[in-house]
Each structure stands twice: as C-alpha cells, then as structure tokens.
Amino acid sequence: MTKPVARAPQRRNARSNRARILATARRELGRNPDTTLEELARAAGVVRRTLFGHFPGRAALLEALAEEASEVLRGAMAEAAEPGEPADRALAHFTLLMWPVGDRYRMLLALARHDLGVERVAEILAPARAEVTAILERGRRDGVFPDHLPPAVLSAGLEAMVVALLEQVNTGALEDDGTRAAVAILIAAGVPERHARTVVESVGPAVLARSLPAE
C-alpha cells in the first residue's frame, strides 16, 4: 500500500509563493501601476501558472492587496492613543502609526479609481477616517484645535495632504519616517509650528519603535 503524500510542505510552499507575489505586487505596482501580471510573475520569481493559480486575474490580485491593507490598517489602529490622551498628541500618534501603512500600500491610491473603485478604497479607509474625525472633534471641544472647519471636512483635507506626501515619497522627492508628515498634519490642523514639533518629538520615539513586520 502506498503512503499518503504529505501535503504540509506543499501548503507551506503555496503560502510562501502567495506572500512573495503580494510583496512583489506592492513594490512593482508602486513603481508602475500598469505592470502586467506576467511582469509581476517574473519579478516574483514564479511561473505564470503559479501566479494565476493564486490570482486568476488582475482584479483578484488587487482585491487581495486591498484585503491585506485593510487587515494591516486594523492592526495598526489597535495601537492608537488612549481616549484620554490630549488631542494633539493623539493626532500625532495616529499619523505616525498610519504612515508606514500608507507607505507600504500607497500603490492602492494610484489604483483606486481605475481598478479598485473609490467605494472599495473608502471602505478600507473608513475606520481611519472615523478615528481622525473623532480626534478633531475632541480637540475642538478642548480648545486644542481651532473651529474654522467642521471636523469631517478638516479630516478630509488632512487625508488629502497625507496622500500628497505619500505621492512625493513615491516619486523620490521626499524621504520621511512619518515625523515630518506628523508635524505637517498638526500645523494644518491649527497647532503652532513650535508646539507641533515638540509634540511629535515627544510622541515619536515610542510610536516609531512599533514598526510593521518586515516584508
């Protein structure tokens, strides 16, 4: 009688291939959103059939990236500041937490309208948008932030700024671990520059130590 074929090594190999394809897709699509699946397969070091075995088409690959981004975002949000933290510190904390997530998945921003659809990206970002709006509302009540704009409107403006900064990272015009972005966000929210820098210098080291897992 023949022995059953061991499946565990095959499953591990399949998981490894899938993870490598996704990591390659993040990198290559960030460089060129028009990269083809065939080009991604070559860059990942797998044959075309292996890639299509995991992802039957471009839409399936992008949806897998979107789901991965959503999971990483939720995990990062679990490290958000405590509710009692002053709003300026909470906003700096949150910006620093989100920066590496945005940096890793910034290619989704370029693909949002054409491939994923604005609604899918909005679904992924909904928890982060709600958190920032809540911080701004609390800061306005506490007199930390001015009330020149409704919190939801200001939140949208700050998000657009982060997207613009990430695009500059994508082009190589900006190098940032999130510190400069956090200062810019606080200033845009109405915090004086000197105080914004002091807040980020205070909050930054502990938050930056919580890096995303390596690729």
Stretch-by-stretch model annotation:
Residues 1-43, 60-63:
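Basic, helix-initiating cap at the start of DNA-binding domains
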Residues 1-5, 134-141, 167, 171-215:
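C-terminal peripheral helix-coil segments that are non-catalytic and often amphipathic
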Residues 45-55:
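Short hydrophobic/aromatic patch on the recognition helix
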Residues 55, 60-69:
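Alpha-helical DNA-contacting segments of helix-turn-helix folds
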Residues 64, 71, 75-105, 117-120:
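Hydrophobic alpha-helical connector segments
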Residues 68, 116-167:
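Amphipathic alpha-helical packing segments from all-alpha helical-bundle domains
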Residues 110-119, 201-202:
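Short linear capping/connector segments at secondary-structure termini
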